[in-house]
């Protein structure tokens, strides 16, 4: 199963790369290479169309992005752009994981309260939903002002984007057990705590993993957004802002940072998916 999934991901990435270069072939800027990738073979190509969105400034060639990854991040430094972005990705991942865990715990706690106290659910769930209507790019500077320009603000933003899907999915999962199972537990004088641990929580695990896969990528997005106004010293958000200032002269660097950010989100999603497959062996997955 895992080999098929890995092959599917590899095929998807290959198709994206083919579509990318096909767009350049048809509507990009003219190509001229005196020695392509150091092979000594040169060629020239003049695309039949001129589409601004496919120009080298808007959409660099994949091999130009790869070349930028292998080049020094700054002139005179031994560190390559790839090494710099890997370090930035690890920094972002640290903030995202903390926000992911805290957001998941908050979401599960809120869902548990709402399931057991319907009055609180009717009173507060609309506000939980309304909180997600606030644009995160507008909320992030306010969080930075309130909590300071450090990793704390980044973690809070990642938590903010994580708790909502977990809350909604956990509410559905905790409400999913067969009522007869709950009545059976109560017939044995089980209290709410026992029913929660032995019936409700186990039944909610498939729903939780569906939400956690969404929250994993959301936490990466939140961490990257938070690193912009957060004033942190590293991270992919900081790299994206820095490279955006030099986009006219070096668009490949910004695209490299974007691609690494995407790979980080895919990696985090994959890790949660592996945990789901391991813990839910033989159980049917659900979609929320």
Where are these regions (language model features)?
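Conserved small/polar residues in nucleotide/adenosyl-binding loops
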Residues: 1-2
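Short cytoplasmic-facing helical segments at TM-TM junctions of multi-pass membrane proteins
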Residues: 166-208
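Transmembrane alpha-helices
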Residues: 156, 160, 193-226
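Transmembrane-helix boundary motif in ABC transporter permease subunits
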Residues: 98-128
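Pore-lining and gate-forming transmembrane alpha-helices of multi-pass membrane transport proteins
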Residues: 9, 95, 214, 222, ...
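Periplasmic/extracellular loop-to-transmembrane helix junction in inner-membrane transport proteins
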Residues: 28-101
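C-terminal transmembrane helix and the adjacent membrane-cytosol boundary/short C-terminal tail
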Residues: 175, 255-288
